[in-house]
């Protein structure tokens, strides 16, 4: 069976509550992006508060240009676990490049485990839910190195 996930782990010198607060704030996601795609939310975004919450994020990739992702919170356990699944906003200009292709089914999840004031953070990128074979061919969309960079940036953002 093909493995459809990658992950990276880092210990951050901060309590889980502080790490979780940064991850739960979409306004800070540009500071965390190890792949260089996240440009920020439209205006001021509310903090994430539970499974099913939706937030949008402006993105950019060379070759695709500017686009917007609609993210749905898929995991939410305060100070322990948070994650979301992105899907392209069908109303953004770049969506026409994917007409007829289901560009959903992948998730980003962070698991936090605190010990002695420090937090072990594991970021997992998973695409087991991708149903469209055309879309699945281009996975993974990020690398383990991107996840490692993201964790390094998270450590800096937590301060």
Residues covered by each model-derived region:
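Intrinsic-disorder/low-complexity, polar/charged segments enriched in Ser/Thr/Lys/Arg/Asp/Glu/Gln
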Residues: 3-11, 17, 54, 68, ...
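Short, charged, low-hydrophobicity "junction" segments
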Residues: 51-65
């Amino acid at each position: 069976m093909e493995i459809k996930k990658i992950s990276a782990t880092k210990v951050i010198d901060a309590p889980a509550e502080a790490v979780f607060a940064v991850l739960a704030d979409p306004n800070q996601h540009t500071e965390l992006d190890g792949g260089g795609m996240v440009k920020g939310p439209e205006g001021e975004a509310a903090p994430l508060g539970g499974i099913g919450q939706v937030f949008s994020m402006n993105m950019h990739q060379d070759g695709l240009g500017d686009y917007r992702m609609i993210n749905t919170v898929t995991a939410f356990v305060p100070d322990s676990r948070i994650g979301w699944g992105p899907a392209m906003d069908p109303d953004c200009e770049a969506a026409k490049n994917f007409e007829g292709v289901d560009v959903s089914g992948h998730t980003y999840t962070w698991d936090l485990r605190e010990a002695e004031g420090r937090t072990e953070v594991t970021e997992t990128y998973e695409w087991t839910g991708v149903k469209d074979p055309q879309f699945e061919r281009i996975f993974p969309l990020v690398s383990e190195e991107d996840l490692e960079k993201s964790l390094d940036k998270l450590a800096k953002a937590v301060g």
